[in-house]
Regions:
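Membrane-embedded and interfacial regions of multi-pass energy-transducing membrane proteins
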Residues: 1-399
């Protein structure tokens, strides 16, 4: 165990340094003319994530250091046999591990803010609210760790406070979701594969968030704690949101990274297959958990057999589909058409250069073209060669 603790301690430094790198890069390397509220919303999400990495990871490092000292020296810190308190370890662990959830979900939300506006061809609704909600989520993530410990023996007052704070997290999350939906309202929606992933994200994230309300409610959590309901909720938030956003981002930026277009129709079909198989896997687990099926049991009551079979079937279908998605992307490296500079009609900086970008992204020593962020009126689709371009040469200002 000691080598594992030492390894995790060292890995924590990589997270801290990465966060510092992101914060400094955003502060110091924005192009001339790009103020804070001219940044892409993806950068706001990355910035909020980096703040969590810098502030939360040291707590994990100190916890591992205390655990290391306890093991080596024999001082009672967490081990009750030595006079320690295991609940203290839970507090330290969850103080890091709940913000760590937002390290995964905030970049996913940032990706959604990009995909939805690009494929709706409409200015993002409530830019400043989405930006501030990212910072709000980062700050609130440090205040709700105790909802993981409702049944661990902490005081009733602490349970009540953490329950109330847990519900407050819904505010910045809902701000994002409703602004995304408002962006889609009466928009010119293009159902390309990245947009399919984005729409899936909104629905799955909504289910994950709404089921979290039950777990944040004290008396309900006593029944649902450590059941399959928690397993399903976690996967709707982490896999149904973070992983879905990852695949949406992968399909969105793949042409820019590789210079190749993948097969679009199979990509759409496989995205829909993931949606079907994901829900087949995890919806039955909500029912099982509500009916008392505990997690981490290798066996189960016969009345849960059908739902376990459905869940297993969905998992197998999803696994095969994810493999096919990967193959579709890899095949495009050899057989895919050459990607245009701006295949989706994006207005952020990466779409103002070639696919893939040259070294240093833009020619060294020349002004960086700074387009009007999330403005699509001057963009037209090239029906012959594919991709999008501006109507006028001066649509993007130079900075």
């Amino acid at each position: 165990m000691v080598p594992a603790v030492a390894g995790a301690f060292l890995l924590g430094f990589s997270s801290i340094f990465t966060g510092l790198n992101m914060v400094v890069t955003i502060h110091k390397f924005k192009p001339k003319g790009m103020g804070w509220f001219k940044m892409p919303l993806s950068l706001w999400g990355i910035y909020a994530t980096a703040v969590i990495q810098v502030l939360a990871t040291p707590v994990l490092g100190l916890t591992l250091l205390l655990l290391f000292v306890e093991r080596i020296v024999g001082i009672g810190i967490f081990d009750p046999a030595l006079g320690g308190d295991p609940v203290l370890f839970q507090h330290f662990f969850w103080f890091y591990s709940h913000p760590a959830v937002y390290i995964m979900i905030l970049p996913a939300m940032a990706v959604m803010s990009e995909l939805i506006t690009v494929f709706a061809k409409k200015h993002i609704f409530g830019y400043s609210f989405i930006a501030y909600s990212s910072i709000g989520l980062a700050l609130l993530s440090f205040l709700v760790w105790g909802h993981h410990m409702f049944v661990s023996g902490q005081s009733t007052l602490a349970n009540m406070v953490f329950s109330a704070l847990t519900f407050s997290v819904a505010i910045p999350s809902a701000i994002k979701v409703f602004n995304w939906i408002a962006t889609l309202y009466k928009a010119d929606i293009h159902l390309d594969s990245p947009m399919i992933w984005a729409l899936m994200f909104i629905l799955l994230f909504a289910i994950g968030g709404l089921t979290g309300i039950f777990l944040g409610t004290l008396n309900v959590d006593v029944h649902l704690h450590d059941t399959y309901f928690v397993v399903s909720h976690f996967h709707y938030v982490m896999m149904g949101s973070a992983l879905i956003a990852f695949f949406g981002a992968l399909h969105y930026w793949w042409p820019k990274m590789t210079g190749k277009m993948y097969a679009e129709k199979p990509a759409v079909i496989m995205a829909l297959m993931v949606f079907f198989s994901f829900n087949l896997t995890f919806l039955p687990q909500f029912v099982m958990g509500a009916r008392g099926m505990p997690r981490r049991y290798f066996d189960y009551d016969p009345r849960f057999e059908l739902m376990h079979q459905l869940s297993s079937l969905g998992a197998f279908i999803m696994g095969v589909t994810l493999f096919c998605i990967l193959m579709n992307l890899l095949i495009s490296l050899k057989t895919g058409k050459k990607a245009p500079a701006n295949p989706w009609g994006g207005t952020t900086l990466e779409w103002q250069t070639s696919s893939p970008p040259p070294l240093y992204n833009f020619p060294v020593g020349q002004p960086i073209p700074l387009p009007e962020l999330y403005e699509y009126d001057n963009l037209v689709k090239d029906e012959v060669n594919g991709g999008w371009h501006y109507k006028k040469d001066d649509a993007a200002t130079e900075a």
